[in-house]
Amino acid sequence: MAFALGVSQDYPLILAANRDEMHERPSAPAEWWKDCPNILGGRDLLAGGTWLGVNRKGRLATVTNFRHEADNQSTISRGHLVSDYLATEGDAENFREKIDKEKKVFGPFNLLIFDGAIFHYFSNRAETARLEPGVHAISNVKRGTTLPKILRAKQGLEKCLSANDLIKCLFKLLSDANTYDDLSIAEETERMPHDATLFVKGPYYGTRSSTVVLFSNRGKVRFLERSFTAKGELRGECSYSFTLPENSKSAP
């Protein structure tokens, strides 16, 4: 995933992310949750959490696993980290304390939370950090790791910031199934399977959905999602837009 924080004058936060997952894992497309009406996002129908979501107060959260590190099968689904933050009333510091107490029961994770002003990074494999304004990218590895797909995502988002059609540019970036092993972007990194492409195609594992989230300087949020088949063909798409409460923070 890649996101721009405090870079665009029109959009204090721009996020573009792909969800790569086993095709057999059941999930639902993004919607306002019936059992928690303030949460908007897709849903993991196996464990009940989500990989990416926002709430009506302007919070955002998203999580990744560590693809090259084995999970403890007895752990709680990482998707609950996202839904728990979006459902809570506490601030980021309170949530950090909660994670510190419970992080051992989760498999390896990167968790990003946005409270409407500040982007926080949490992990049970790396140090907590407050992310500064700028363009960032992260994948299924520790923050700060350099991989072809991470560099491609960051560079692609930087170019999209000046595009005439921002949303179109972001979805085009997320649909990029090319590899970059023969370019300088890969010469600086260690080559690993699937780490050189943004959009993963495969019969068992691949990109299940692409999501673009925009927080505007006018207090509006747009949440757009496209879902895909195992062949990488478009399965469906949805778009949501809502206005934040006036007392919500609107800029990093």
Predicted regions and their residues:
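N-terminal nucleophile
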Residues: 1-252
